[in-house]
């Protein structure tokens, strides 16, 4: 009997240790202090991290998207967030963009690194920037589809690899682990309980497109 109880304790301990308590803490900060709605993402396939744990064998964002629950379940409720990450302690943190939460503009990592270096030299103020091994995302104020359409229409050229994460979209937040690798803050939010400051989408798109043009990032790199 003691042997059975000891074995059960070891199994329970192993399950708890397999989780990452910093994910729960980060999810609670985002949801309750910043009031940004989050939900757990589908994790990468444990048999191969480049593959997704969802049923789609050709998933293009492995381990970096919502699946069950769906995106509409995103919430700022502390009890729900705690329940999710207690039961799925290694799940990526997915931010539902738009509405009362920030939106995002993302671009390939190499191009983003060059663009941010130029914007730094210009002393442009940026909000938080999320980095994965393949793409970086600049958080911006919420925008409407109409606003985005007018902004892009006014441009002579917009790199095709720019992605816009608005209402109904999502991004993975640090310290998530996805199929492409670790998600981290390239520009972390300033410490404090208030929601992080984010710039207008117009300022970011104008600056990023101009920076990419001036740094000579070619279409294949984008």
How should these model regions be labeled?
Residues 1-135, 139-222:
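Conserved phosphate/metal-binding and DNA-contacting active-site motifs used
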């Amino acid at each position: 009997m003691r042997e059975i109880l000891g074995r059960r304790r070891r199994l329970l301990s192993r399950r708890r240790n397999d989780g990452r308590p910093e994910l729960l803490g980060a999810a609670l900060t985002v949801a309750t202090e910043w009031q940004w709605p989050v939900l757990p993402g589908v994790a990468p396939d444990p048999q191969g991290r480049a593959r997704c744990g969802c049923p789609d064998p050709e998933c293009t964002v492995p381990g970096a998207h919502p699946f069950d629950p769906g995106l509409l379940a995103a919430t700022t409720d502390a009890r729900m967030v705690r329940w999710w990450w207690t039961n799925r302690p290694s799940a990526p943190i997915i931010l539902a963009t738009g509405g009362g939460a920030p939106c995002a503009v993302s671009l390939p990592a190499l191009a983003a690194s060059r663009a941010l270096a130029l914007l730094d030299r210009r002393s442009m103020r940026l909000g938080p920037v999320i980095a994965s091994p393949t793409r970086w995302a600049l958080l911006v104020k919420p925008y409407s589809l109409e606003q985005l359409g007018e902004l892009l229409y006014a441009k002579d050229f917009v790199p095709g690899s720019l992605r816009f994460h608005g209402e109904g979209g999502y991004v993975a937040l640090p310290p998530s682990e996805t199929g492409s690798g670790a998600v981290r803050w390239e520009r972390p939010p300033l410490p404090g309980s208030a929601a992080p400051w984010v710039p207008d989408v117009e300022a970011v798109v104008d600056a990023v497109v101009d920076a990419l043009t001036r740094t000579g990032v070619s279409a294949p790199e984008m």
